[in-house]
Amino acid sequence: MSRLVSLLRRRGVVLPSFEIYGGVSGLVDYGPVGARIKRRVIESWIEHWGRITNVVEIDSPNITPESVLIASGHVGEFNDKMSECLACGSAFRSDHLVSDFHEAPDTLSSSELDELIEEEGIRCPSCDKVDWKEAMPMNLMFQTSIGAMGGSRTAFLRPETAQGMFMLFPALYRHFRQKLPFGAMQTGKGYRNEISPRQGMIRLREFNMAELEYFIDPDDP
């Protein structure tokens, strides 16, 4: 992976963001070559699905009101469990820390993760100490607000593009003259406040998405 990341960087495909100010993990820039590749991939994807007569393209906002994401379950359930090192303050995904000791670490509860970390004497990858806070859930969405001061509404940067298509379902249903099936596709940015982004571009805090939602009548698919 490190060799691939180094090659992409040298060739101007993908580079670390804000590097002259120390960089920010989980954020990348697309260089001259990477930007062209990305544009062509997106255009090809849209062209492919656009050939289907009952699939349309939409474009919805990156900022999503809290009420939408409460209804979708993201506010309560869009979490990863985090373990913080008391010695140096570094934070890591708990399931990543125990991945060598359990086949399905993402299924473990916070208490089970704590027990496994203690049993195996897992050391902090940053400082090599064994001194952990209890694992706790961390919501992965970036929170913001809409409006000024007292009149503001809680909102989030969207964790995925799907909600925009679901919100437009009534309008799309009218567009297709109240007939199913039909589909909506969307490309754009998604945002997830990853606890410990790593592995190059596999876990990013801001990333490109391409999604298609296809709506059918379950009684007459």
Predicted regions and their residues:
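TRNA-recognition modules of translation machinery and tRNA-sensing kinases, especially anticodon-binding
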Residues: 1-221
